[in-house]
């Protein structure tokens, strides 16, 4: 593999044929770090979070808490957050970069703090849907001003109440409300109006909040949130990132033998299901409490319900391209409204390499083949949880 910086084109990566073998130490989960940073800021005290890797999305989250009055510093992978002065600023611009997570987490959090804020973003973020909030928050004391998307101006203070939310929208909306509603006076309920998808990310939120002393009660059709709770300062240890581990695990299934280290078998991350799915494909999977080893074996097609694991769809499609038979991936329509249409982008990438992928409205159908061809492809996707 080589990285080119030819001035006549954008940087690109050149891959040469090889059989992947070896061990990989997985970096911390970006999804986990996002949530921990916000919880730490809301303690109004001093916390550490470790290990932390500074991706652009995490930098955006740190920037937002700083603009809301917190201080943050990082050294040797340990992030220190001091939330003493959170919400003591007003009329602030909160730049969420290209992070949908930061945007949808912080809108209700800022509203719970009663600050006047203008949310801005870059790339495709200004076009990402926020209608769930612009419809629900004005009913709960928050004025929202937007011409559709960003910039979004909010003012007023979030009030308790009942929030009816479709279950098939991004779980980021629900996470934002879960983080914010314990801060307001009075109890609240989030009521699902349709079956929940990506529940793993919501469970991760609830798990992280519990580490900081905040309780969420799961009900038959949503969640009950007690008001007037306080986030308690806590030194937080992050999980390894199952989403990133998935790519190396699939490489093992297709190539030789790959071990990923630093992944928690009992993690709240829904993407830990990758180990189970690769075993269903036929790969040899061996798991301990903190590692997974995947070895090549004959792969056979399976059907995959992606409603709870949409971010695994691209890498699962790669695996399916080499599995005998026809694999179907369903219930992933939300991938069409990410930073790009991930279903179309994934299908195009595999087909450009000689694969056979057909798009469905909510997924992909992949016919397995023996090998893909060498070619140039354009990367359109970023991961964002």
Question: What would you call each of these model-derived segments?
Answer:
Residues 2-385:
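Structural preference for solvent-exposed beta-strand-turn elements
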């Amino acid at each position: 593999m080589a990285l080119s910086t030819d001035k006549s084109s954008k940087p690109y990566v050149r891959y040469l044929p090889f059989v992947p073998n070896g061990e990989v130490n997985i970096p911390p989960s970006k999804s986990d770090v996002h949530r921990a940073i916000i919880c730490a800021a809301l303690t109004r005290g001093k916390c550490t979070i470790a290990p932390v890797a500074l991706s652009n999305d995490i930098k955006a989250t740190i920037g937002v808490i700083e603009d809301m009055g917190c201080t943050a510093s990082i050294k040797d992978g340990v992030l220190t957050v001091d939330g003493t002065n959170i919400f003591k600023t007003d009329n602030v611009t909160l730049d969420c970069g290209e992070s949908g997570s930061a945007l949808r987490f912080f809108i209700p959090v800022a509203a719970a703090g009663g600050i006047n804020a203008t949310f801005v973003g870059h790339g495709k973020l200004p076009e990402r849907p926020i209608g769930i909030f612009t419809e629900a928050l004005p009913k709960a004391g928050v004025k929202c001003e937007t011409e559709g998307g960003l910039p979004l101006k909010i003012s007023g203070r979030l009030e308790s109440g009942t929030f009816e939310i479709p279950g098939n929208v991004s779980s980021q909306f629900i996470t934002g409300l879960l983080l914010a509603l314990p801060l307001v006076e009075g109890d609240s309920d989030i009521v699902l109006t349709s079956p929940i998808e990506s529940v793993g990310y919501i469970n991760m939120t609830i798990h992280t909040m519990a580490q900081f002393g905040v309780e969420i009660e799961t009900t038959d059709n949503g969640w009950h949130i007690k008001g007037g709770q306080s986030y308690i300062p806590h030194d937080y240890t992050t999980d390894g990132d199952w989403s990133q581990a998935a790519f190396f695990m699939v490489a093992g299934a297709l190539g030789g033998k790959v071990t990923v280290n630093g992944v928690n078998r009992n993690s709240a991350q829904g993407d830990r299901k990758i180990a189970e799915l690769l075993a269903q494909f036929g790969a040899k999977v061996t798991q301990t409490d903190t590692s997974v080893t995947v070895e090549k074996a004959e792969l056979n097609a399976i059907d995959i319900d992606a409603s709870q694991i949409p971010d695994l769809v691209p890498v699962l499609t790669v695996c399916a391209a080499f599995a005998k038979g026809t694999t179907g991936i369903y219930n992933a329509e939300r991938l069409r409204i990410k930073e790009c249409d991930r279903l179309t982008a994934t299908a195009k990438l595999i087909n450009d390499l000689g694969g056979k992928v057909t798009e469905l409205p909510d997924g992909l159908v992949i016919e397995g083949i023996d090998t893909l061809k060498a070619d140039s492809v354009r990367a359109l996707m970023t991961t964002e949880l």
